[in-house]
């Protein structure tokens, strides 16, 4: 079973304030998840080639041909605020 320390740590990382009842519930659930992971660790994968996807993934490239774009007026038509042909947005970085 997951320890209270693990539950407190995970709750802190997720910025959650848990009641003792919630901690007990989540400790049981986390313990169940860890048990399933232990079961997966026991699976014999000798001779199995590692993969990132169940099926082969290939990129399909389209020709990079220039195409007409939007006019400035069309691009800014729905912008809530604009200045000098640019969209004005709130500052997000100090």
UniProtKB/Swiss-Prot annotation:
Query: What keywords are annotated for this sequence in UniProt?
Result: ATP-binding, Ligase, Nucleotide-binding, Protein biosynthesis
Q: What is this enzyme's EC?
A: 6.3.5.-
Q: Does the keyword ATP-binding apply?
A: yes
> Is-annotated flag, keyword Transport?
no
The catalysed reaction is: L-glutamyl-tRNA(Gln) + L-glutamine + ATP + H2O = L-glutaminyl-tRNA(Gln) + L-glutamate + ADP + phosphate + H(+); L-aspartyl-tRNA(Asn) + L-glutamine + ATP + H2O = L-asparaginyl-tRNA(Asn) + L-glutamate + ADP + phosphate + 2 H(+)
Looking up Gene3D superfamilies in the UniProt record yields: Glu-tRNAGln amidotransferase C subunit, N-terminal domain
A GO term (biological process) for this protein? regulation of translational fidelity
InterPro entries in the cross-refs: Asp/Glu-ADT_sf_sub_c (IPR036113), GatC (IPR003837)
- Give this protein's Gene Ontology molecular function annotations: asparaginyl-tRNA synthase (glutamine-hydrolyzing) activity; ATP binding; glutaminyl-tRNA synthase (glutamine-hydrolyzing) activity
Enzyme superclass (EC): ligase
Subunit annotation = Heterotrimer of A, B and C subunits.
Functionally, this protein is described as follows: Allows the formation of correctly charged Asn-tRNA(Asn) or Gln-tRNA(Gln) through the transamidation of misacylated Asp-tRNA(Asn) or Glu-tRNA(Gln) in organisms which lack either or both of asparaginyl-tRNA or glutaminyl-tRNA synthetases. The reaction takes place in the presence of glutamine and ATP through an activated phospho-Asp-tRNA(Asn) or phospho-Glu-tRNA(Gln).
* Family that this chain belongs to: Belongs to the GatC family.
- How is this protein named in the record? Aspartyl/glutamyl-tRNA(Asn/Gln) amidotransferase subunit C
Lineage, uppermost ranks: Bacteria, Pseudomonadati, Verrucomicrobiota, Opitutia, Opitutales
List the gene name: gatC
């Amino acid at each position: 079973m997951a320890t209270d320390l693990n539950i407190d740590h995970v709750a802190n990382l997720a910025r959650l304030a848990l009641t003792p009842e919630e901690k007990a519930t989540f400790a049981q659930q986390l313990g169940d998840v860890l048990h399933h992971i232990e079961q997966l660790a026991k699976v014999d994968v000798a001779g199995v080639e590692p993969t990132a996807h169940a099926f082969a993934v290939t990129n399909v490239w389209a020709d990079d041909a220039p195409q007409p774009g939007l006019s400035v007026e069309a691009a800014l038509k729905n912008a809530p605020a604009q200045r000098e042909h640019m969209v004005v947005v709130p500052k997000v970085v100090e």
